């Protein structure tokens, strides 16, 4: 099957809310909820120092979508516990898991291991909804193109990240540290 066709099929059934059993493969996609608790005080101390801006008037430490969110695991059908898993992270500016779904499916089928799709801080489903709404973001894209000379490739996909990091580059470090704490917590939760 062509990869673009399979990507569309997986995208159509992917859910953060309910378990999906792949009818044509011996796999299922299970959603799990994550509530950040490891490193919270340290991260909040940093985040409280960050200024808000016109793009986002909510302080980083008050963005609830970043603290409590869902992640998914591709796993062989019916398996309960495995000794090994593959952690699949994403790149910057990613808004959805679409292109990673076929990768996760392939890795799980080829290895027999669970594949965890875990979002890094302030990406994917860890952001307010208006950060990935094209209609809401297009005025910001136009504004960004006016503010930054020779900027030709600004799109709604990267405008949230661009505004937030240009305004306060320290956000990149703090988000990385927050993601590290989240992964540490995830690994501890998986082991118990």
Q: What is each model feature region?
A:
Residues 3-5, 12-81:
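N-terminal cap/lid segment of alpha/beta-hydrolase-fold proteins
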Residues 134-191:
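Alpha/beta-hydrolase active-site loop
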Residues 70-146:
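Short, surface-exposed "cap/lid" segments of acyl-processing enzymes
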Residues 65, 83-84, 91, 98, ...:
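Alpha-helical context
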Residues 56-62, 116-123, 176, 190:
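Generic low-polarity alpha-helical segments
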Residues 61, 87-101, 166-176:
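Short, charged/polar micro-motifs that form catalytic or ligand-binding hotspots
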Residues 1, 191-192:
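Repeat-unit-sized solenoid/scaffold elements
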Residues 43-54, 117-123, 127, 161:
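Charged, low-complexity, helix/coiled-coil-prone segments
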């Amino acid at each position: 099957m062509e990869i673009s066709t399979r990507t569309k099929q997986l995208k159509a059934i992917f859910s953060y809310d309910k378990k999906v059993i792949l009818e044509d493969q011996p796999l299922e996609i299970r959603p799990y909820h994550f509530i950040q608790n490891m490193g919270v005080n340290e991260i909040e101390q940093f985040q409280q120092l960050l200024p808000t801006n016109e793009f986002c008037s909510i302080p980083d430490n008050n963005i609830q979508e970043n603290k409590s969110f869902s992640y998914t695991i591709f796993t062989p059908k019916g398996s309960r516990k495995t000794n090994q898993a593959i952690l699949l992270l994403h790149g910057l500016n990613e808004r959805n898991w679409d292109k990673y779904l076929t990768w996760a499916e392939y890795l799980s089928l080829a290895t027999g291991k669970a594949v965890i799709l875990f979002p890094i801080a302030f990406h994917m489903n860890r952001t307010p909804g208006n950060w990935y709404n094209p209609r809401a973001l297009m005025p910001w894209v136009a504004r960004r193109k006016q503010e930054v000379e020779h900027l030709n490739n600004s799109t709604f996909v990267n405008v949230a990240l661009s505004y937030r990091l240009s305004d306060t580059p320290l956000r990149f470090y703090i988000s990385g540290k927050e993601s590290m704490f989240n992964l540490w917590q995830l690994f501890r939760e998986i082991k118990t």
